[in-house]
């Protein structure tokens, strides 16, 4: 963890925020702040649901391997690209409910993620460290790199790269403005936003992959306690930008201007 990690700006009290960021390639750079703190997952849990379904389909959870059905593909697209909750309800059941999602988590290395036992998947809890571990598994990196089959990893990433424009905020704010080809959405993302009934305060979280300084990065930013949705989105985006900037040499440099870029190949590029 770089020495300036503790000085990353925090959210407006009473909000909390945690983050974990790392290059996609197995490199030593990383940054974490409160990465083991527990947060309500909201719709970032939808990536976990899809990964759990994929494991079930590929036969990794003691079930016979089979093909993904056309209905499951349609639900998955709606759940990730548009954050459709009805589709998430259906896939939660298809993935085996809380028991199936929990079993998948053991394989994926998300030890501190707790699936809600009553079917209210958005109230499952997780940590930024677990979300980073899940992203690494989805991208075929780290000790769980072979848990998901190649087709499953590609499926999850493809859908996270197709999230509708109105939901492409969050960690994508850390991407270089010209890191991707013209007209191509920036990176892969899934966001969560949820006002808590008891307090009216917002859970705002974002996970995904972006390209910055010529390198792909995996980021997870979880937060809660925001008085407005807009305040939470701004805090998450600021934290994502500052975390990646602290890990690169691009501070103050606009990638649209001529000049040398950092080494490493850029890789290809989702609420309630």
Predicted regions and their residues:
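A general structural signal for well-ordered alpha-helical segments in protein cores
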Residues: 47-50, 88, 236
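Penicillin-recognizing serine hydrolase domain
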Residues: 1-28, 93-272
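Short, structured coil/loop segments at alpha-helix boundaries
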Residues: 33, 62-72, 84, 145-157
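Conserved catalytic neighborhood of penicillin-recognizing serine enzymes
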Residues: 58-104, 127
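A short glycine/serine-rich beta->alpha loop
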Residues: 33-40, 117-120
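Short alpha-helical patches at coil-to-helix transitions and adjacent helical residues
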Residues: 44-47, 81, 85, 124-132
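Acidic/histidine-rich, surface-exposed loop or edge segments in extracytoplasmic proteins
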Residues: 29-34, 50-53, 81-85
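Active-site SXXK
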Residues: 38-64, 79, 219
């Amino acid at each position: 963890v770089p020495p300036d990690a503790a000085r990353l700006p925090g959210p407006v009290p009473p909000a909390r925020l945690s983050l974990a960021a790392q290059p996609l390639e197995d490199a030593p750079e990383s940054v974490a702040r409160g990465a083991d703190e527990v947060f309500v997952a909201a719709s970032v849990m939808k990536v976990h649901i899809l990964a759990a379904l994929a494991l079930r389909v590929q036969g990794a959870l003691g079930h016979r391997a089979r093909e993904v059905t056309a209905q499951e593909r349609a639900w998955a697209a709606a759940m990730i690209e548009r954050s459709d909750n009805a589709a998430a309800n259906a896939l939660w059941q298809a993935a085996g409910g809380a028991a199936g999602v929990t079993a998948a988590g053991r394989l994926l290395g998300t030890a501190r993620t707790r699936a809600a036992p009553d079917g209210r998947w958005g109230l499952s809890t997780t940590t930024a460290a677990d979300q980073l571990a899940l992203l690494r598994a989805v991208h075929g990196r780290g000790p769980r790199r072979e848990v998901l089959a190649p087709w499953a990893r590609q499926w999850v990433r493809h859908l996270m790269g197709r999230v509708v424009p109105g939901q492409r905020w969050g960690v994508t704010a850390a991407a270089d403005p010209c890191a991707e080809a013209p007209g191509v959405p920036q990176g892969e993302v899934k966001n969560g936003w949820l006002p808590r009934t008891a307090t009216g305060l917002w859970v705002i979280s974002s996970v995904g992959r972006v390209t910055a300084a010529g390198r792909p990065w995996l980021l997870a930013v979880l937060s809660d306690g925001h008085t407005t949705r807009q305040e939470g989105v701004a805090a998450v985006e600021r934290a994502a930008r500052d975390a990646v900037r602290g890990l690169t040499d691009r501070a103050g440099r606009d990638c649209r201007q001529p000049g040398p870029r950092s080494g490493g190949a850029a890789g290809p590029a989702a609420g309630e």
